[in-house]
């Protein structure tokens, strides 16, 4: 989508591997493997696609991929050797400091891992120093107080988000919320409590 008021595009953090059974659930393997061949560990390769929305007054990044600070054992397990988000943003003429809002649709590691990074001293810091991080309050509460069934869905990536709160970059919202004119966060059933999508309207589109 692109017009004189807004542009919307995909910016990739690369790919990762996830267990095919976890991805397709009740769908029999004999059906899904026709289109997605698993590796020897039954993992299928998925894209880590983030969305970049550019309006006349704001740059908005939707989700951040896995990021670069996961331990080597985790990178190997998920087949994600390095983060490509910053490089691909630069290809779009955007630096981390240019991002005004980071919208995290939910807080599983493959969506929020790149929200923070490690500096040269080993400290966890926000990846986007000037951005407000927009998160549903229900998603935040669930991530930091998960029930026993939800614990495996979250990782250190969530704990690292505390630094965003400490630096006053956290913007918790409740329900459908307009981020900037024409760009709205909309709560929608998904993989976790407080999951949301982002809608963009401009020029009659």
Which residues fall in each region the model found?
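Basic/polar N-terminal segments that are highly enriched at the extreme N-terminus
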Residues: 1-7
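Conserved beta-strand hairpin/beta-sheet module of binuclear metal-dependent hydrolase folds
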Residues: 6, 13-92, 197-205
């Amino acid at each position: 989508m692109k017009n004189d008021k807004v542009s919307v595009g995909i910016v990739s953090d690369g790919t990762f591997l996830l267990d095919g059974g976890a991805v397709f659930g009740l769908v029999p393997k004999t059906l899904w493997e026709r289109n997605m061949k698993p590796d020897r560990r039954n993992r299928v390769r998925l894209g880590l696609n983030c969305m970049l929305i550019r309006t006349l007054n704001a740059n908005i990044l939707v989700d951040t991929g896995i990021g670069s600070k996961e331990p080597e054992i985790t990178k190997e397990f998920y087949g994600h050797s390095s983060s490509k988000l910053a490089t691909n943003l630069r290809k779009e003429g955007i630096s981390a400091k240019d991002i005004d809002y980071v919208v995290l649709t939910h807080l599983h590691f493959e969506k929020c891992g790149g929200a923070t990074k490690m500096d040269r001293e080993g400290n966890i810091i926000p990846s986007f120093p000037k951005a407000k991080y927009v998160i549903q309050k229900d998603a935040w509460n669930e991530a930091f107080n998960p029930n026993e069934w939800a614990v495996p869905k979250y990782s250190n990536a969530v704990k690292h988000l505390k630094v965003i709160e400490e630096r006053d970059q956290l913007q918790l919202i409740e329900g459908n919320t307009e981020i900037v004119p024409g760009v709205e966060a909309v709560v929608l059933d998904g993989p976790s409590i407080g999951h949301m999508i982002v809608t963009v309207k401009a020029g009659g589109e």
